[in-house]
Amino acid sequence: MIVAILGAGPAGMSCANACLSFGLTPVVIERHAQVGGIQRANFHENLWMLGSPGETGQSLTERLAEHFHSLAVRTLFRTTVQHIQSAAQGGFDLQLRSEGQVASTLHTDAIVLCTGMRPRATPELLALADASTRVVIGPLNAVIRDHMCAARVLILGGGDNALDHARFLAERGNRVTVCTRTRFSGRETLLAACRAHPLITLRPDCRADTFMAQAQGVAAHWPDDEQVEPFDWLLVMFGYQPNSEVVTCFDPAIRPERDARGHVQVDGWLRTTVSGVYAAGDVIDNVQPAVPTAIAQGLAAAKAIERGRHHGGQVPFGGLNH
């Protein structure tokens, strides 16, 4: 039984490993040249992986990748899915395009969506980041660690990541302004630490309406001030959004449903609304998105496929309760 796994982050690698144990044949499809997903750029300590105190996301990813590469798993790198349709003989036909190669078709019996998530930003801020290297989208960027020193930094966002990075940067001599459109929603301990730090300014109900790229930074214009305020760096911390656009590659008749925030909808067995299609990791709505969560769900998705096979085929969304 062939299982196509879309994405080679922690969820995808875990799913492939588990498929082998369950007698399934995984084929991993990864659009980048490496495994690991966004954790490849995570220089922060991973607080959620029990048994690995002090280990960064990058180091953890290296360990996962080393194990994954030791497995007998067919992995298609630099490959994107162009279209997915039901196959006449059952299962699915995936039209693939690999970099530098002609288009190809892969027939599979099941599909697992493990495409992860990416930092969220408005189209205007994404365009600004394309125009200026002084604009950083999201927390997983080594520029934050290696190049922001004794500088003026503006952080947009009011959650844990925004406050945690304000503290991280202030401790390295940066003067940090944190701007959120409403109130701060981060943990109270982080908020208290930021309030107490002399190099951090917190601005709730702050609605900067214009940002302009400059030679050595970014200028921000506040609606209540006729002047612009210069910063050396702009850091956008608006959280994350799921990489669920892959569902648009499915034929409309078999397109998995998404919720209002774009997460792929699944039941307790990680089955989507389409029989034979599963999803795991950050592409679905999790109580706590984290590497351990993704690893566990990759395993669970493989188990669900194996269990469905022993129940006479794929079980529909919400079924197989026992």
Each predicted region: which residue ranges?
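A Rossmann-like FAD-binding core segment of flavoenzymes
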Residues: 65-108, 171-263, 307-322
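FAD-site-proximal beta/loop scaffold in flavoenzymes
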Residues: 129-147, 237-290
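A conserved FAD-binding loop/helix module that cradles the flavin
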Residues: 17-18, 165, 280-322
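Beta1-alpha1 glycine-rich phosphate/pyrophosphate-binding loop at the start
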Residues: 2-73, 163-188, 258-259
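Phosphate-coordination loops involved in phosphoryl transfer and adenosine-cofactor binding
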Residues: 2, 78, 149-152, 205, ...
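Nucleotide donor/acceptor-binding cores
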Residues: 1, 24, 110, 150-153
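Glycine-rich dinucleotide-binding loop and its adjacent helix/turn
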Residues: 115-167, 172, 264-267
